[in-house]
């Protein structure tokens, strides 16, 4: 296993610090791999009610999972640009605009879970192949510097943040 040391402040934005903080494990790749089953179980519990949301105007479970998959892809794309030494300043994105453009309601929840798992496994494969020197490469997203190792940790932290929201806000008002 390649040792992936923890990113330091300055390798990610203040906004993304919360995602980094949600990943205390030393073995990041093992944690990312193990999380797939946790996520599948947590979201799979809503198989009968994928259009449930915890309040009017809030995302449905199906939309939440679609968002998680979109962000996994975005973070992975940023990570690859930076790992390859591309000097392009990468754009941010507005999640609510993306949600309005997406049509996650047309997909069955099990299919969305399978898609998220496929994207995660693809990223794990990429991460396992990165040379050791790539982990500390820096790039710019929006107005902030990020390293490859920070983006990799943020992938898992973002997933965990949304599972926390699922437990705290969706579960207490889950139908039937």
Residue ranges and their predicted role:
Residues 30-45, 98-136:
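Acidic/histidine-rich alpha-helical segments that form the ligand environment
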Residues 24, 35-40, 72, 159:
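A general secondary-structure boundary signal
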Residues 21-24, 97-112, 141-151:
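Acidic/His metal-coordination segments adjacent to aromatic residues that form catalytic metal sites
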Residues 25-33, 58, 62-65, 109-113, ...:
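Amphipathic, non-membrane alpha-helical segments in soluble helical-bundle scaffolds
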Residues 1-18, 50-95, 121-124, 132, ...:
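Short, contiguous alpha-helical
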